[in-house]
UniProtKB/Swiss-Prot annotation:
Gene Ontology CC, one term: cytoplasm
Role of this protein: Condenses 4-methyl-5-(beta-hydroxyethyl)thiazole monophosphate (THZ-P) and 2-methyl-4-amino-5-hydroxymethyl pyrimidine pyrophosphate (HMP-PP) to form thiamine monophosphate (TMP).
Ligand binding (Mg(2+)): 78, 97
A biological process term (GO) from this entry: thiamine biosynthetic process
Alphabetical list of InterPro entries matching this protein: Aldolase_TIM (IPR013785), ThiamineP_synth_sf (IPR036206), ThiamineP_synth_TenI (IPR022998), TMP_synthase (IPR034291)
Record organism: Dictyoglomus turgidum (strain DSM 6724 / Z-1310)
Listed pathway(s): Cofactor biosynthesis; thiamine diphosphate biosynthesis; thiamine phosphate from 4-amino-2-methyl-5-diphosphomethylpyrimidine and 4-methyl-5-(2-phosphoethyl)-thiazole: step 1/1
Protein's name in the database: Thiamine-phosphate synthase
Keyword Aminoacyl-tRNA synthetase: no
Coiled-coil segments: none
Gene designation: thiE
Signal peptide: none
Amino acid sequence: MNKKEKLELLKDFNLYCLTCEEYSIGRKNIDVVREILEAGVKIIQYREKKKPMREKYHEVVKIRDLTAKYNALLIVNDHLDLTKIVEADGVHIGQEDYPIEVAKEFLGENFIIGLTTHTKEQVMEALRKGADYIGLGPIFPSYTKEKPHPPIGIEILDWAIKNISIPVVAIGGIKESNIHEILNLGAKCIAMVTEIVSSPNIYEKTRKIIHILEGYKNGKYIA
């Protein structure tokens, strides 16, 4: 896929899954990602905050092989060097990470660059700086980070969906139980962490979420 085709996945009804071994109830990131991909997910973000860099490298190499096998995107959280070394599809950076312009200069134009945003001002700044997509949230309370950001609610998400030209990935506390609230606003690409990785049956849970997304895409649900 070229970059334009990759970005289409972020614009469409897709599940965007993030790794989080800490919440994977004893399962390794590799095994979790394999199940997620087998279930049909096309976007994986490798997010691992606590492991040594060498361990992250060996892990992300294996995940890159898996995503290539399943023709899925691999986005690496934070690490520009890992992104480039393993030839991932892109990087996702936070508000306190490298500036977008630095990431663009280091990686080049063929890599996708996503940015975490929490406010309208940050969203507009992401547009000005040339982000390829934004992650907007946390929509609901989320505790996967050591210092979680307060939930921003659905109002900003509603505004972004109606006013932003680049893909908006909704993230933060999204579950099977509240996903319809997000999709009814017009959101398409939905990020999930613990709802997937903490599920006793990752494959089954992932298929359920994909089925819901396909229902909206095919008009089964009226937004």
